[in-house]
């Protein structure tokens, strides 16, 4: 981290914004935290550096602006603070709100209005108890009692997270976690006795009150003590909620029900052994919260929510899911704008036919799931190789899981090494730790390259032009039923779980993925979905919702010459893209 600290120091002397994104390449979180100040440490107007603070400069500039551009996370923080305190002071006053990519708002709102607590939540309190360095001396605790409180609070906080880890499946505690993120739902009120942690947090607030009471308002030490007291109170409320589960999954009414879970993240990190444990909680129904806090915000003249994938498909039925999730008022005006693209001329949808002999993407009951998944992914890789040949490279392949991506990448690289791909085609893979930005730039620059990636390349990625002449989808991107939030939403929906929650979420994700294909009026691209559940012809396991899936991505399901033509013939991809067939006998 020493080199990163030096880079930050040099950059800090010249930056005009203070935004971390300016640092290229990036720096470690540890180095950034060593040089940055969190909101808990900020002494506000009492800071001697107030006049040169980048955060205050940005806030002051926004207050004077006619138009303010921010992100959804900051908007939701503004709404939450307004709801909790009655004062909306995160953003300057506004009377018209335009939300882009509004399809992302519900899940981000669940996170913003939910609960997240990792071991790091205690660090700010422990830092204050430890005392800051003064005059080059060692750390000096604010009061004589702080050292004892620190010792016992740290011990009991560690015990809380150890108890959480003990509830995880045994596989999460082994050496074969392989970077996975695992979850366990909390549904037993009183599963842990948090009284000890609560006791020491109350003691923190008592000591903080002593310090704040002995200083003048605005004094930096007074502000730090007040911030510490607020943070301790936040942790107390979180611990109480997580251990008592007041809203449970059984007793609460649907509109106020919340789900709680423990998350174990096994991603490798420097200076860390074992998984990172995080407690999370989220409301199931977020629509009522958004209806009150967003659409019903006092002083607003208009709210405009826009997205290329706001609805789940054409027709009035496509608005059912977004209306409920976004809390859109009944009297709001909704408008689905036709696409500016000529999909009938510019694109092609390729789905499995009987000749593809695709196995089921879902393991039969009682079958070995791992072996079944490997068999399906191997079949997908075969189709992907045919797609790459038909498109002469120029393919973005999106996979629904890390395991499928890894296996498919191995098979595609093997085929490339054996000379089974067109000469000069470069294979790029989104491997753990790989820079998404660098992969995206390389894919765009190398027109005939192939990129195998996960969901992050299915959204917010603009590969316009010839470089993305084919989009390959290995499997319909249904959400994981193992995700605690998804499990809670499906349980709350009862017998209607598939049509109410599961299918709409898949359709929205798939629409995003397919949207990578055609970005301008001059683009020409094919979309290949390898999942036989949307296939055509006898012997293909197409589902009753196959037509809904095709309609959602703009396909010509009624054969009227409007929308993407549908075919099971990969050779039509060559014709669409103007790629010559290989010589007879060539692979």
Predicted regions and their residues:
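A substrate-engagement module of RecA-like helicase motors
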Residues: 1-68, 73-76, 127, 133-144, ...
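A contiguous, basic/glycine-rich beta-loop/short-helix subdomain that forms a polymer-engagement track
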Residues: 32-68, 76-88, 211-347, 351-353, ...
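Conserved phosphoryl-transfer catalytic core
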Residues: 102-103, 107-185
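Conserved RecA-like ASCE P-loop NTPase motor core of nucleic-acid helicases/translocases
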Residues: 304-308, 393-400, 529-530
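Conserved RecA-like P-loop NTPase helicase motor core
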Residues: 352-374, 431-535
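Conserved interdomain hinge at the start of the Helicase C-terminal
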Residues: 355-400
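Conserved helicase motor "Helicase C" RecA-like lobe of SF1/SF2 P-loop NTPases
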Residues: 400-431
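N-terminal targeting/trafficking signals and adjacent low-complexity tails
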Residues: 528-587
């Amino acid at each position: 981290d020493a080199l990163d600290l030096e880079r930050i120091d040099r950059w800090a002397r010249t930056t005009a914004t203070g935004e971390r994104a300016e640092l290229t390449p990036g720096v470690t979180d540890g180095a950034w935290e060593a040089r940055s100040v969190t909101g808990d440490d900020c002494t506000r107007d009492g800071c001697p550096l107030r006049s040169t603070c980048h955060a205050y400069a940005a806030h002051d500039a926004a207050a004077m602006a006619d138009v303010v551009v921010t992100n959804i996370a900051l908007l939701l923080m503004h709404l939450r603070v307004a709801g909790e305190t009655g004062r909306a002071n995160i953003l300057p006053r506004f009377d018209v709100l335009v939300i882009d990519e509004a399809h992302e708002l519900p899940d981000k709102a669940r996170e913003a209005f939910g609960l997240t607590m990792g071991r790091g939540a205690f660090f700010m309190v422990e830092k204050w108890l430890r005392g800051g360095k003064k005059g080059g001396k060692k750390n000096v605790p604010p009061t004589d009692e702080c050292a004892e409180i620190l010792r016992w609070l740290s011990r009991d906080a560690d015990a809380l997270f150890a108890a959480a880890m003990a509830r995880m499946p045994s596989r999460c505690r082994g050496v074969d976690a392989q970077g996975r993120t695992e979850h366990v739902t909390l549904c037993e009120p009183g599963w842990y006795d948090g009284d000890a942690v609560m006791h020491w947090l109350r003691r923190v607030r008592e000591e903080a009150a002593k310090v704040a009471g002995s200083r003048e308002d605005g004094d930096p030490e007074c502000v730090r003590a007040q911030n510490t007291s607020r943070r301790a109170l936040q942790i107390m409320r979180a611990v109480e909620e997580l251990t008592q589960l007041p809203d449970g999954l059984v007793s609460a009414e649907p509109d106020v029900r919340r789900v709680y879970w423990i998350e174990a993240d096994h991603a490798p990190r420097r200076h860390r052994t074992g998984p990172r444990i995080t407690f999370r909680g989220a409301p199931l129904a977020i629509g009522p919260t958004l209806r009150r806090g967003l659409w019903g915000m006092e002083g607003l003249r208009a709210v405009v929510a826009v997205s290329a994938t706001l609805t789940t498909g054409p027709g009035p039925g496509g608005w059912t899911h977004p209306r409920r999730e976004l809390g859109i008022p009944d009297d709001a005006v909704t408008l689905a704008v036709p696409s500016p693209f000529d999909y009938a001329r510019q694109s092609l949808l390729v789905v499995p036919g009987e000749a593809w002999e695709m196995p089921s993407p879902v393991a039969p009951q009682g079958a070995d799931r791992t072996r079944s998944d490997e068999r399906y992914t191997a079949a997908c890789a075969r189709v992907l190789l045919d797609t790459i040949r038909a498109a002469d490279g120029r393919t973005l392949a999106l996979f629904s899981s890390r395991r499928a991506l890894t296996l498919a990448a191995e098979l595609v690289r093997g085929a490339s090494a054996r000379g089974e791909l067109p000469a000069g085609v470069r294979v790029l893979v989104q491997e753990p730790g790989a820079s998404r930005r660098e992969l995206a730039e390389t894919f765009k620059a190398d027109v005939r390259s192939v990129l195998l990636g996960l969901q992050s390349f299915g959204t917010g990625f603009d590969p316009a032009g010839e470089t993305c002449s084919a989009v390959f989808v290995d499997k319909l991107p249904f959400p994981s039923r193992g995700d605690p939030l998804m499990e809670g939403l499906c349980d709350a929906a009862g017998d209607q779980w598939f049509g109410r929650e599961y299918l709409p979420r898949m359709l929205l994700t798939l629409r995003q993925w397919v949207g990578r294909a055609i970005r301008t009026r001059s683009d020409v691209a094919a979309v290949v979905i390898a999942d036989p559940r949307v296939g055509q012809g006898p012997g293909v396991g197409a589902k009753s919702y196959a037509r809904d899936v095709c309609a959602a991505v703009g396909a010509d399901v009624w054969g009227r010459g409007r929308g993407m033509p549908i075919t099971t013939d990969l050779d039509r991809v060559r014709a669409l893209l103007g790629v010559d067939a290989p010589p007879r006998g060539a692979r």
